[in-house]
Curated annotation (Swiss-Prot):
The keyword rRNA processing does not apply. Keywords: Amino-acid biosynthesis, Cytoplasm, Histidine biosynthesis, Hydrolase, Magnesium, Metal-binding, Zinc. It comes from Corynebacterium glutamicum (strain R). Binds 1 Mg(2+) ion per subunit. This is Phosphoribosyl-AMP cyclohydrolase.
């Protein structure tokens, strides 16, 4: 099994349901297994989703770095993926994960804990 997400191809039955944006990406919402707390939002392409499904490791595409990002590979804050679902339109992916350490790149438990607006 390769550690290069780009070598993974998404099953056609899944891929034909996805509605990717013009950049070939789909938003991925990540929730904590057991509590359903929203931890983060990231982007995936078909290779990142295929790699995630094959390895159960949260894998995303960084738009700013233009590269794949396997959550926790450098930080140790890994995501064991326990569930993956598409929304009714196929334009958003929902991942359920067992999170080790912080989910946010800042090290915080969630990316949504700093600026509560309401």
């Amino acid at each position: 099994m390769s550690d290069n997400p780009q070598e993974y191809e998404l099953d056609w039955d899944v891929e034909k349901r996805l509605k990717l944006n013009d950049a070939g990406l789909v938003p991925a919402i990540v929730q904590a297994d057991g509590t359903n707390e929203v931890l983060m939002m990231a982007w995936m392409d078909t290779h990142a989703l295929a790699y995630t499904l094959a390895t159960r490791r949260g894998t995303y595409f960084s738009r700013s770095r233009n590269e794949y990002w396997i959550k926790g590979l450098t930080s140790g804050n890994v995501q064991e993926v326990t569930g993956v679902a598409l929304d009714c339109d196929g334009d958003t992916v929902l991942l359920t994960v067992k999170q080790t350490g912080g989910a946010c790149h800042t090290g915080a438990h969630t990316c949504f804990d700093n600026d509560v607006l309401l």
